[in-house]
Amino acid sequence: MRVLGIETSCDETGVAIYDTETGLLANQLYSQVKLHADYGGVVPELASRDHVRKTVPLIQAALREAGLQAGDIDGVAYTAGPGLVGALLVGATVGRSLAFAWDVPAIPVHHMEGHLLAPMLEDNPPAFPFVALLVSGGHTQLISVTGIGEYRLLGESIDDAAGEAFDKTAKLLGLDYPGGPMLSKMAQAGDSQRFTFPRPMTDRPGLDFSFSGLKTFAANTIRSNGDDDQTRADIARAFEDAVVDTLAIKCRRALDETGFKRLVMAGGVSANRTLRQCLGDVMAKRGGEVFYARPEFCTDNGAMIAYAGSVRLAHGASQTLGVSVRPRWPLAELPAV
């Protein structure tokens, strides 16, 4: 079974084709980073217009890459939420229209389920059950996962997501959008002993997160210590260490609560090398395993949507005629299969 996946939830246009027997056949991605860089963040209207321009050409490119024709596709999966409503509507409209024209099922996919299942594309996929750390620009959540659609929210950010905090702090440090990866690179030259940032909400029970205060702490530290290159690197290091340590503390608590031996991390921030090393050490000490996707499948992409769509389609999921998206969509509302 071959499924075409379309991702347009924010500022990346992703299209991929996944075959349930042979794996990923094609993967095309267009990033809008340069488009939004001058504005310091994603402009929803510009994002939607660029998706309109890029989605169909990327679908054509994916079919060429896979050496397939329209008649070879068995289903069309598209991101139906959460995300920017205009951007979502572009992918949903194109996906639903193609499914109707090709007389194949259309499968609406939850963006975060796509991220959660992305490690399944690797050679050593995780087995159920596991704790999932979903950490991106829009979400920071800990999820108990016992099967497809069997998701229980353990904790989440009460304000900024970790990725959002990275980008905002990077902006304070004078880095261009998107600043998170640049902040991490800057942190490599930082002195880990110079500044100590707080580990928010780790001094109390619970699995929720809060990262907005770290941005404020960074701003105050910058004002108090100047803005030379080394100071900025030291602040970046202290900030990254605080975020990574906070995530690790909460992951340990979630593993203790569930008793699971496997940890999956997914989302854009899961590509962070410091976080990968830290959680790898955590799981090694516990005699468990940590799983994550290759870096290109951590950020938004069509491959994760095609895969998640293939899993749902194999269990009978499809949408009737009509287009609907959900800018807000709790993961726990998804049906189990």
From Swiss-Prot:
EC nos: 2.3.1.234
Binding residue positions for Fe cation: 111, 115, 300
UniProt cofactor(s): Fe(2+)
GO cellular component, one term: cytoplasm
Reaction catalysis annotation: L-threonylcarbamoyladenylate + adenosine(37) in tRNA = N(6)-L-threonylcarbamoyladenosine(37) in tRNA + AMP + H(+)
Keywords noted in UniProt: Acyltransferase, Cytoplasm, Iron, Metal-binding, Transferase, tRNA processing
Comment on bound cofactor: Binds 1 Fe(2+) ion per subunit.
Binding site for substrate: 134-138, 167, 180, 272
Alphabetized InterPro entries for the sequence: ATPase_NBD, Gcp-like_dom, KAE1/TsaD, Peptidase_M22_CS, TsaD
Enzyme class, broadest EC rank: transferase
Location in the cell: Cytoplasm
PROSITE patterns cross-referenced by the UniProt entry: GLYCOPROTEASE
Predominant place of localization: cytoplasm
GO terms, biological process: tRNA threonylcarbamoyladenosine modification
Xref: CDD domains: ASKHA_NBD_TsaD_bac
GO molecular function, a single term: iron ion binding
Family, similarity comment: Belongs to the KAE1 / TsaD family.
Record's function text: Required for the formation of a threonylcarbamoyl group on adenosine at position 37 (t(6)A37) in tRNAs that read codons beginning with adenine. Is involved in the transfer of the threonylcarbamoyl moiety of threonylcarbamoyl-AMP (TC-AMP) to the N6 group of A37, together with TsaE and TsaB. TsaD likely plays a direct catalytic role in this reaction.
Name of this chain's protein: tRNA N6-adenosine threonylcarbamoyltransferase
Species of the source: Pectobacterium carotovorum subsp. carotovorum (strain PC1)
Gene: tsaD
